[in-house]
């Protein structure tokens, strides 16, 4: 039976019921709905609606139901209840009879679902933070094992300057650390309880909402009932964090897809995260990474969809807000799966050091070093830049790297060039000179690894 049937003289059309019902997705809030109901039953004792004995009976029944749901969650979807609140209340009435009908006193599904969703978000963000830190740790470990793997760094997908595979890994550690921080910040803002705000104007019972918030593990209670039941900022904020996090994972995937190509050949992915072709026997496709890259779009879509849903809603609650859950649930599921998969990809990756080194030595990645060398000899940088550009053109014409041009040919471009230029043009020198904080020098990379290890514990 619907929770609101008394006002109506006709039954809902079955097509409307199917359109309106949300149990098929909000069943995921079952545990939070039960936990919230236990806390609400305690609050009802403080205002004389329930006796201590009645509350104990309700709490015992709700705890039994909670264990039952954890053991067999699929039972919820066997019901034709409208939503998870109706299902929980129906099951409670089955267990304790008429007493179960007293539990909803002073409470609306509006503040109830807002509370359930915030509790779910807190639980799920905790899982995401764990997965995020696990991936950071995997990246740090990969970096530690590849500090000497020199490879080309890219701008515009053109070889630019030499870096190391470790430095590349640490770039993604920084991105993931920001994702972690965004989630932690979002938790601070959603950690306020809307329970006790009723439908929109507050509850008529003098419940201590701060005490109630504490029972549920919230830092405090919300301050305005109208805002409380219509606020979905936390959904937008978490979807935004997910969207940004998935952009980072998509870029991570794209880099490794490129590194894994036959043309680059910097890494080889494990058989455990690749698949073959139904036609071409030789193929080993980076499906795990391509799926991470592909799934990024659906998370961006969830954020955009939720913004469009909320942008024109008047205060307070509107049924449009039922659309807050499916996109959020899917986005969080997707992000969590991709974090785990990215860590699995790293677990079996092989870095091909000789090929990385060979590629780093090509493409005139040491051209900037020659320009800096000229600057150290007193040549203005803009002039040095032009000189080196001309030298690169000549090296390309001869099919040689810069360091293989004889001294007399280099001196045609600038008389200040001497024999001391050749050590400067080595890959190791290119790395060693980048010793400012955040640079690719071995010392800076080692410090960055140590810092990340200390932060991650």
From Swiss-Prot:
EC number: 4.3.2.1
GO terms (BP aspect): arginine biosynthetic process via ornithine; L-arginine biosynthetic process
Gene Ontology molecular function: any one: argininosuccinate lyase activity
Any single Gene Ontology cellular-component annotation: cytosol
Coiled-coil segments: none
Reaction catalyzed: 2-(N(omega)-L-arginino)succinate = fumarate + L-arginine
One Pfam family hit: ASL_C2
Protein localization: Cytoplasm
Descriptive protein name: Argininosuccinate lyase
Record organism: Shigella boydii serotype 4 (strain Sb227)
